[in-house]
Structures are given as structure tokens and as C-alpha cells.
Amino acid sequence: MHPEEDWLAQVPVGGDAKRNLVASEISGDGDVDAVLADCDEVLEHAYHMRSFNQAMMETFRTYTELDRYGRLHVISSTQIVFHVRRILSRALGIPKSKIRVEKPRIGGGFGAKQTAVSEVYPAFVTLKTGRPAQLIFTREESQIAGSPRHEMEVRVRLGADKDGHIRGLDLYTLSNSGAYGEHGPTTVGLSGHKSIPLYTGGLEAFRFGYDVVYTNTMAAGAYRGYGATQGIFALETSVNELAEKLGIDPTIIREKNMLREGMKMPA
């Protein structure tokens, strides 16, 4: 995965055929470049986090039936009952009021079950036949149909004075959404929105930008940490490298720069 100059997709991967960009944004506060130019120490590194899949104990599974009122009753191992109802309504062409989704206690999810995976197939059978239907995925099927963590490349520019006070942060994330982009625009935001505020203590300026791209790979989705994990790993590693370069205990660096009562967190 790498940025392409014009975001031109070489093969059909959905979305806008003229580019493979799912989402893009730049936000911040202050003149980051000027602050970094005035810092005693500036670190610039890129960190690559690979994609990998969940393995919750209970695989994807759904049972469907028509209740006494003729409504579609869906019992599913899911984390998103109302999203499932909305998705089934659109997929099957029936009103949401005709669908009831029930979530029993599930055997793990870690975010994988924040995607509608097994619900539509038995629901379609029940609507066509009027009979109950059930679908239970094997472990192999769950791995194939699941949604792994987003592969990300996070580039960090960090500026500080010689005493370890972090004055400027510039963070850019390139996120691989895979063939579809349902969680792409939301997970990537957390890579910066959950990491940069940790170092608000003496921060004079910050910038956070991201691009999310379609690629011809498995569609990524929710995975424990939901994008924050990748961003925090990158920034925390940079802070450790700053501490080593300055010869200051990493804990002291964090104490000097942590958010304190009364401060406003950048968002």
C-alpha cells in the first residue's frame, strides 16, 4: 500500500471510478511548520501497522423466522442490532418496522460483529419460503468473511525543546480500507484524535491529516481500538525516541506534556 500521485485506481474497486480515495481530511491549529522550525529537536518517522483478523470464540451465526405478526425476527450474534435492521431493510426492500433484530449474549466479537456478515442470507430464505432459517459460519468462513484491522502507515513529525517540552505535532495517516469503505472514514480519525490530545500540555500547534484508500484486498472494519491503536503506537514510539535522544526518562517526558485539569483537548 502506498499513496499514488493522482489516486487513480488501476482496477475496479468500487466508489469513484476516477480515484481510489474513500476519505480525506486535514485539520489542526496554529502554524505547525513555523513551530517545528523553531524547535531544538525535530523527529520525523513513519510507522507501518499491518492488517490482521479477529478470532472470537463464536463464529458468525444468524437465525431468522416470521413472528405472529408477520415481521422478520432476526436472532444474530452481532454488536449492531439497529444497523443490522437498517441494512436488512435496504437489502430486502422492506420497512424497518417489519424487522426485529435480537442480540443474545454473544461469544466474543472484538469489533468483527460491528459488520453485518451472516444476517442477510437466512433472512432472504425466510422471506421467500416463510420458514425459519439458520446460518452458522465455520471458522474458515468467518476468517474469509470477517473484517480485519485497518493497515495503516502513520507519519509523525514531533518538535520539542531541549528540556523535553513537546511544542508541535504533525501526524499523517494513510489507511487501507480494502475493497469497501464502511468503517474507513471513522477509524482513521481516531488515529489522530485519540493520540494528539495526550500531549496537550505545552503544545503550541498541531496538524492531523489522513487519506483512506480502496485497495483490492479484504475489506477492513472495526477491530479493538478502532484506529486509535495505530495512531497511539506511532506517537508513543516517537515520544520514546525523543526521550532517548534527549537522555530524559520517558516517564518524565510524559509528565511534562500530559493533559492537565482546565486544559482544552484538541479534537
List each model region and its residues.
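Structural alpha/beta core scaffold segments of enzyme domains
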Residues: 1-267
